[in-house]
Amino acid sequence: MIKVKPLLFHGLFGLVLKSYIALIIAFNFMNGKDTVSESIIPDLKVKLLNGSSTTLHQLTQDGPLLIDFWATWCVPCKKVMKFLDEYHEKYAKENFKVLMINTDTPRSLAKVKSFIRSQKYSFNIGMDPNKVIAKKLNGMIMPTLILVDKGGVVKWRHQGYVAGEEIEIEEQIKQVLGKNINEKNKG
């Protein structure tokens, strides 16, 4: 009698299939399970670059918050920052805030401070050198943007940045602000 080995998990095809399955599992795990639309963002403590601390819920008490995970080595992160700073200033009267959470190592703190100083950004800078917040909010792919409304509800999530996407980012901000403005007009 001849034994026939199932070819499904053997050889190159098996390796490719196993890799594909692993990627699907990893993607589903990393795909923002704590920050899916309409979920409440966890109230995580954030250490700010200026040495003070705050929480995500404190930052959303007065208005919406856009969280962005970034690193000094991330070119797309640096490109989107100028737009996020512009939106931070443009919509400040509506209590909109931007929190840029840096994930560089503790050794890079001086580099982070120098970069922010040189750019004269006005948004809040959080530090997450051990990537605790990034892992909890599934922000390990950079940049990851998470837009949260005044109540702490995640309204939009986006990973990556290419030129032109700043238009979509601002549209999402306007949508969340429109809801908050309508709530103010009712009261």
What feature does the model see in each segment?
Residues 147-187:
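Thiol-/selenol-based redox modules, centered on thioredoxin-like
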Residues 63-64, 81-102, 117:
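Conserved helix-turn-beta segment immediately C-terminal to the redox Cys motif
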Residues 63-65, 69-73, 141:
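Short pre-active-site segment immediately N-terminal to redox-active cysteine/selenocysteine motifs
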Residues 45-64:
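A short beta-strand-turn-helix
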Residues 95-109, 121-130:
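Thiol-based oxidoreductase modules, predominantly thioredoxin-like and allied folds used
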Residues 69-86:
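Conserved redox-active cysteine motifs that mediate thiol-disulfide chemistry
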Residues 115-150:
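Short, internal strand/loop/helix patches
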Residues 1-47, 156-158, 185-187:
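N-terminal targeting signals for export/organelle localization
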